Swiss-Prot record:
GO terms for cellular component: cytosol. This is Blasticidin-S deaminase. Its EC number is 3.5.4.23. It comes from the Eukaryota. SUPFAM superfamilies: Cytidine deaminase-like. It comes from Coccidioides immitis (strain RS). Keywords: Antibiotic resistance, Hydrolase, Metal-binding, Zinc.
Amino acid sequence: MAPEPLSAAGQNLIDTATSVINGIPVSDFYSVASAAISDDGRVFSGVNVYHFNGGPCAELVVLGVAAAAGATKLTHIVAIANEGRGILSPCGRCRQVLADLHPGIKAIVIGKEGPKMVAVEELLPSIYAWDKDYDRI
């Protein structure tokens, strides 16, 4: 599946996450915002919670916010770093969780030509399918 050019909905997600992160005072604890859209058009946002013993990335916070609101399928997601650092590609853990919980979701990432939308499965080659590891279940 080829990457898609940025859509109006994708730009809306970038704008939403940028607004969220720009509205938070500069902090070592909240440095990334994320926004996602559900298949029914609702937009959800959240921020990471950094702590030295670990904490959720912004994308994972958004998954929880969306689930709490009853969203069952997210179609697109983006993460924006603070201090003008812009779009971040999801980390490996987030890629795996996104692929497991929302198969087919597209992440907005930066390409050579600017932002583009890419299926998360393409960002995580040879994806681990935990539900297919029958020897472990």
